[in-house]
């Protein structure tokens, strides 16, 4: 496994706004304080940096973290978390194409991630089809914490995590409404209102209504969001934040796939269009409701010690009717299908208790963190499947989308599951500053339990099974960063992760958790005037204890000897080149390999892992006669990836262009104060591109999308 190093170009992307804290950075103290105050005003007193769970500056953290702030989200007009991550290095989005947007599916440093965090708490996922999504309309910024994060967050993949920071009440009255239209007969309205109620209370109200045609023919997308929150100053040192997030998705487009032949690969009979739908409009439904009710209670005992309790309750449900495909027939056009449905509901609780303090020992300042968190999920799942490909087949080049008669379907298989899982974690962290040296160390103990009760019915035969997981794990993290003159800060770190693994080996011994560890080194840069930032990082991640097939009994219990290695380089930065022009770029070079397996997969690269990714975005503010105008443009490149696990073919690389423009109408007339218009285009030249899991399951990338928006702020 050899990693080729191309010429490195200095690149740029926003890392973060400086946070509050008594520890001095290398930049002037007045700039730090002003920026910190501004950040805390926007993000709220209960905000904590994702990488440390403290108010410390991410630029001091010896591990890579990328931040996409609210201004960037607004300028680019994103409508999903995956879209918001398109310009983040090390992250590959749209794993299932652009027509599928009901789930946030992406990988970080090569490892798939299906669970986001919202305001520091896990969005609980039942590992089936009920994944809570947060719409960007309710997000203040996104923070991508690269590498293992288990010391602070418990069970997570080793590639990293995404934390979505919610919009919080502000004391200054601000009200924004907008309407939008565009591709797919888009109809959208948004509301964002905040202000003080009295000296103790401040509110925020965010709302959204969106309806549009999906990319695939016959499909629709519809979403409603209602997200109020309240800050209650209970005293000079105590703040209570109450928050609600409700989202209803009556329709969520499609989830069906297309074969590689006719999409990512040539078919002798022709090629499919990017609006292809190989499901059935009589059996295509996804209806989801998500309610998140939470609070944050923070109290400052004094200037050195604070406590924060962050808690949330989730109630979610989803109903789905869909089809899946067999391999394409020998005639290169007939596709056999099965019909299935899922009916799912989940209820869960997540709570995180944090005690943070500052202690001086000689010339060293310690920022201590002690935490205890707990999560519980109760999930119920019904799955029914016709099996035997008894649903009507479809001609991929002349599809009939109305063949299925729901009442005539016979379900030969049914599975009812009740899943109850809990995780308790205790963690300790110390971040120490000694002059220009910043060192961090942390440890965490986790206890994970899961019980699964399954009752299956297959062609009239009833059976029941019980599965139990009781695993614990100890995770560690260490790192150091040194601030040199000129704004450069080299760093190095080591971090660990774990993920529970169900089942037992052939001796009946329960499997151990899958573990990961990462070595990372790099350098961060922040100019004195804070107009330029950059991060160069090199990483090496190893994931162990993956399940593999026993070569002596391929249908028997698995062996726990699998190993995967991901290593690479990321370059990220941002520069304000002039007062009118800014530039952001990033580059990722990654090599991922299955290094231990009992099958021919050893030595292969997993799917969805391009070797190279790069992007560039620039904003220009003309001024003069065009005062109030902004024009932005971006390029994003995703290299070729493996088409299937056996690496038999490649998914082609692609280069896409996005654009956006906005204009403050007050520049035309003072009577139009507060009004603005914007225009955004994604995949401007309508490039056709693909994503594949294997030869039978591919997805089209997002077609060109254009959106026009009228805003009014008062």
Please annotate each region the language model reported.
Residues 296-300, 306-312, 318-322, 513-576, ...:
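Membrane-embedded beta-barrel scaffold of Gram-negative outer-membrane proteins
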């Amino acid at each position: 496994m050899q990693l080729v190093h191309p010429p490195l170009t200095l690149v740029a992307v926003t890392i973060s706004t400086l946070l509050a804290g008594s520890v001095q950075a290398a930049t002037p103290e007045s700039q730090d304080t002003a920026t910190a105050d501004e950040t805390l005003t926007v993000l709220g007193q209960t905000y904590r940096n994702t990488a440390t769970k403290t108010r410390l500056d991410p630029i001091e953290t010896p591990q890579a973290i990328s931040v996409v702030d609210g201004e960037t989200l607004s300028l680019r007009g994103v409508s999903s978390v995956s879209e918001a991550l398109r310009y983040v290095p090390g992250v590959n989005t749209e794993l299932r194409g652009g027509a599928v947007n009901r789930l946030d599916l992406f990988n970080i440093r090569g490892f798939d991630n299906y669970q986001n965090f919202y305001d520091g708490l896990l969005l609980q996922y039942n590992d089936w089809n009920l994944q809570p999504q947060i719409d960007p309309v309710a997000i203040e910024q996104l923070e991508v914490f690269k590498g293992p994060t288990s010391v602070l967050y418990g069970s997570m993949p080793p590639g990293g995590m995404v934390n979505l920071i919610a919009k919080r009440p502000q004391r200054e009255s601000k009200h924004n409404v907008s309407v939008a239209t565009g591709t797919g007969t888009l109809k959208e309205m948004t509301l964002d209102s905040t202000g003080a109620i009295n000296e103790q209370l401040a509110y925020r109200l965010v709302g959204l209504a969106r309806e549009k045609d999906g990319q695939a023919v016959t499909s629709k997308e519809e979403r409603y969001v209602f997200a109020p929150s309240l800050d209650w100053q209970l005293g000079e040192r105590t703040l209570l934040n109450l928050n609600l997030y409700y989202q209803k998705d009556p329709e969520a487009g499609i989830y069906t796939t297309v074969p590689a032949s006719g999409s990512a690969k040539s078919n002798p009979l022709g090629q499919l269009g990017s609006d292809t739908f190989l499901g059935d409009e009589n059996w295509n439904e996804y209806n989801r409701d998500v309610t998140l009710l939470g609070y944050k209670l923070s109290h400052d005992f004094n200037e050195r010690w604070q406590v924060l309790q962050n808690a949330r309750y989730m109630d979610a449900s989803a109903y789905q009717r869909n089809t899946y495909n067999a391999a394409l027939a020998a005639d290169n056009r007939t596709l056999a299908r099965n019909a299935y449905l899922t009916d799912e509901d989940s209820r869960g609780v997540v709570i995180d208790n944090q005690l943070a303090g500052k202690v001086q020992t000689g010339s060293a300042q310690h920022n201590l963190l002690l935490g205890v968190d707990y999560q519980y999920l109760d999930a119920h799942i019904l799955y029914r499947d016709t099996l035997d490909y008894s649903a009507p087949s479809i001609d991929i080049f002349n599809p009939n989308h109305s063949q299925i008669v729901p009442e005539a379907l016979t379900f030969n298989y049914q599975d009812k599951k009740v899943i109850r899982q809990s995780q308790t974690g205790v963690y300790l962290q110390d971040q120490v500053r000694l002059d220009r040296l910043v060192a961090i160390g942390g440890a965490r103990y986790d206890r994970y339990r899961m019980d699964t009760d399954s009752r299956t019915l297959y062609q009239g035969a009833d059976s029941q099974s019980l599965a139990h997981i009781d695993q614990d794990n100890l995770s560690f993290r260490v790192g150091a960063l040194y601030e040199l003159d000129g704004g450069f800060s080299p760093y190095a770190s080591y971090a660990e992760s774990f993920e529970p693994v169900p089942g037992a080996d052939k001796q009946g011994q329960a499997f151990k958790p899958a573990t990961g560890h990462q070595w990372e080194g790099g350098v961060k840069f922040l100019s004195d005037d804070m107009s330029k930032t950059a991060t160069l990082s090199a990483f090496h991640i190893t994931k162990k204890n993956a399940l593999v097939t026993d070569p002596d009994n391929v249908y028997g219990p698995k062996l726990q000897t699998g190993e995967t290695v991901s290593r690479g380089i990321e370059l990220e930065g941002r520069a304000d080149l002039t007062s009118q022009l800014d530039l952001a770029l990033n580059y990722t070079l990654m090599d991922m390999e299955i290094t231990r397996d009992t099958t021919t997969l050893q030595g292969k690269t997993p799917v969805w892992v391009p070797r190279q990714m790069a992007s560039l975005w620039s904003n220009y503010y003309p001024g003069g006669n065009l005062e109030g105008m902004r024009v932005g443009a971006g390029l994003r490149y995703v290299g070729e990836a493996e088409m299937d696990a056996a690496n038999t073919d490649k998914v082609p690389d692609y280069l896409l262009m996005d654009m956006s423009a906005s204009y403050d109408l007050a520049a035309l007339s003072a009577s139009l104060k507060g009004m603005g218009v914007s225009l955004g285009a994604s995949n401007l030249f309508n490039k056709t591109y693909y994503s594949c899991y294997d030869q039978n399951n591919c997805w089209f990338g997002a077609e060109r999308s254009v959106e026009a928006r009228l805003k009014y702020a008062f």
